[in-house]
Amino acid sequence: MKLTSIPIASTLLSLLAASGTLASPLHKRDDPLNNKQFGLMSIHSGNSYVHLHPFYVGDSGAIYLDPTDGTSTSAVFSMSNGRLVVGNLYASVDSNGTTIFKSDANAASTKFSAGDATNVGYNLLYNGTQSAVACPASDNDQVYQVYFGAGNGNPNCAGIAIEAFVSPSSSSSSSSSAATSTSTRVSSSAKASTSSGAIAYTTKCVVVPVTASATATAKAASAAASSAVYPLFPHGIRLIDSANPSSNSGNVYSPVVFQKQNNHTNTIFTFDVPQVSGSCELNLHLDTSGFPITVEGSNGVGQFILFNLSSVANDSTVYSNRPNRIAEIGRFNCSSSGCDYATNVTCPNSYTAVSYEMMALTDDSYLSFFEEADPLEGLTLRV
């Protein structure tokens, strides 16, 4: 928390003292996350167990980065005077950082706060620092539990940054006043209810509110920009290679697309889809503000094409068994300075998954980049 501007406050106090008038007490600034609804997402590049994972609160009250412990839907949080809240539960942090949500407000930690603003919200701090750690859960080393401290001692624990992305319904770019709506914990039985404005989404689906600049970019990129609200990041990115048709890349963070004569390396993007708003848009935004992008092609410009697919790619998908293409979605060019492309697509059904394939259109066209949330870079699906 910061006090009001010290030079201004000092000047006012001096003037009031000189005039014999009593000064009003100084107040701490209101935390920008106070009484807002927001989702939380972990950031740790290069670690697929923790990078770009939403937060889940299990039946035990512990925080996880994947569905487990009786929950299948990521949590919606709020902040109240330094306390992290899910529904009527409050985060309690013990000496080793174990964090459990409990109904006892008196046991709640009051050390949570918003850090620096980002493109999609704020960094979440505990005790003024980014001290969070994600460790393999004791009963499942494929699922990581979040601690605000030392962790559980597992050698595979990883430090994480935490991004809080605020629901558009509880914040406004033109007003800093806090919303009065209360946070709700979204259960699997209530997935279809979003009237509260809470951000609800399914397994590994990362939902980030659209910023004003991102919206303007999308509109400039496509005259047919839809009214879709949230960009979803892919939870699966898989490379398929015609020269090695049985080779499995696994899940990657850096899509690669190129064509060399008859050899193709294509990328399949898979998205988990929450409740659909009624219109959907596929959007690609790349520039030089994030991780480096690599583009090759005629006169430095690569040409690429997108397809929608008949089924969803999975961990066993390779070039030889890739899903069939339904139709071409569109084509776009990209250079070393980046590219913007947006097009309306047929909406998938709510609470399903959908895959799209990106391919080079011309010989020697090459594109590689890194999907990231801050700054917003890569291919996203808006629903």
UniProtKB/Swiss-Prot annotation:
Kindly list the cysteine pairs connected by disulfide bridges. Answer: none
Which InterPro entries does the record match to this protein?
Ubiquitin3-bd_protein_But2_C (IPR018620)
Gene Ontology, cellular component aspect: cytoplasm; nucleus
Record's subcellular location: Cytoplasm; Nucleus
Q: Please tell me where this protein is predominantly located.
A: cytoplasm
Q: Which Pfam families match?
A: But2
Q: Does the keyword Transcription regulation apply?
A: no
UniProt signal peptide: 1-23
Name the UniProt key words of this record, in alphabetical order. Answer: Cytoplasm, Nucleus, Signal
Q: What does the sequence similarity comment in the record state about its family?
A: Belongs to the but2 family.
Name of this protein:
Uncharacterized but2-like protein C27D7.09c
Organismal lineage: Eukaryota, Fungi, Dikarya, Ascomycota, Taphrinomycotina
